[in-house]
A protein has these predicted regions:
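Predominantly flavin-linked oxidoreductase catalytic cores and closely associated redox partners
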Residues: 110-251, 255, 263-272
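Short amphipathic alpha-helical segments and helix-helix/interface helices
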Residues: 17, 99-100, 215, 272
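Conserved active-site and cofactor/substrate-binding residues in soluble primary-metabolism enzymes
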Residues: 11, 15, 22, 90, ...
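N-terminal Rossmann-like FAD-binding beta1-loop-alpha1 element of flavoenzymes
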Residues: 3-28
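Phosphate-coordination loops involved in phosphoryl transfer and adenosine-cofactor binding
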Residues: 1-3, 113
């Protein structure tokens, strides 16, 4: 039986591991930190606009497992917010444990705190990947799903510095591009002004730290939109966002909060 090694345990890594297991392979899933889902732990927005069709297509094609979980732990359904309709919002405080339980129930070999730092190749074939500990993990096929975020040096050089985001590079080490270790040049995104990379489009706030009025609106409606005075509006932040579908004027003219279990403030940063 072939062994597939998946590098990175975010949503895409979990999906790849499940797909490989369903195809009859032995699967090893290597995750750099102590949690699955990566930025999915601060995500939450599903089925909005065209994502609804994409979700239903994936389910119809046999890839229902992860969508069943996000649907099961949905806090708000058929929710509208600026520029987006019929969204479902999953609870980020509950989703990771349940994805972890699913992965383990499928007998996928899940290994946390397993930061991959290098590869061993034979010509154009990858033989193994090397962990920070020096251990080598061998396989017949390797799938890189490490994403494109970090490490800290990039956040310092091209951003506002390390804010200890959910990826927690200071604790677990930064992401290493396995494709670049194989000699493949990574695609590099640029902003309109030519700067490299992009910012996360949102900030997570403790919902209980907000006013009772805002909490009530979030709990009941799933979303709160608070108009900003002219002097606090900053349209330049829109160009910084990774998710350009949220780079609409409404997101600079208002504070847009979404209830994901915590409060998701739809802005890359906000001066207090």
């Amino acid at each position: 039986m072939a062994t597939v090694v998946v590098i990175g345990g975010g949503w895409s890594g979990c999906a790849a591991a499940i797909g490989a297991k369903k195809a009859g392979c032995d699967v090893i899933l290597l995750e750099r930190t102590d949690l699955l889902l990566g930025v999915g732990n601060v995500g939450g927005i599903m089925r909005n606009n065209g994502r609804y069709t994409a979700t239903e297509e994936c389910i119809a094609l046999g890839g229902s497992e992860l969508f069943e979980l996000t649907d099961k732990f949905t806090l708000h359904k058929d929710m509208d917010f600026p520029g987006h309709e019929h969204a479902s919002i999953y609870d980020v405080t509950k989703i990771e444990k349940n994805v972890r339980d699913l992965i383990k129930s499928m007998n996928i070999d899940l290994r946390f705190i397993s930061r991959v730092v290098d590869v061993e190749t034979d010509g154009l074939t990858i033989r193994s990947v090397e962990l920070e500990s020096g251990e080598k993990i061998y396989g017949d096929a390797f799938i890189e799903t490490t994403g494109s975020t970090g490490p800290m040096g990039n956040c310092t050089k091209y951003g506002n510095g390390c804010a200890m985001c959910v990826l927690r590079c200071p604790s677990f080490g930064g992401r290493v591009s396995i494709t670049s270790r194989c000699g493949i040049e990574d695609m590099v995104g640029r902003r309109n002004n030519g700067d490299l990379g992009a910012f996360s489009g949102s900030i997570k706030l403790l919902k209980e730290s907000l006013s009772q009025e805002v909490q009530k609106e979030l709990n009941e409606k799933g979303c709160a939109v608070v108009p900003l005075p002219e002097n606090l509006r900053n349209e330049e932040k829109l160009d910084l966002k990774v998710c350009q579908q949220y780079a609409l004027p409404e997101f600079s003219e208002n504070i847009v909060l979404i209830d994901t279990g915590h409060a998701k403030l739809m802005s890359p940063f906000f001066n207090l």
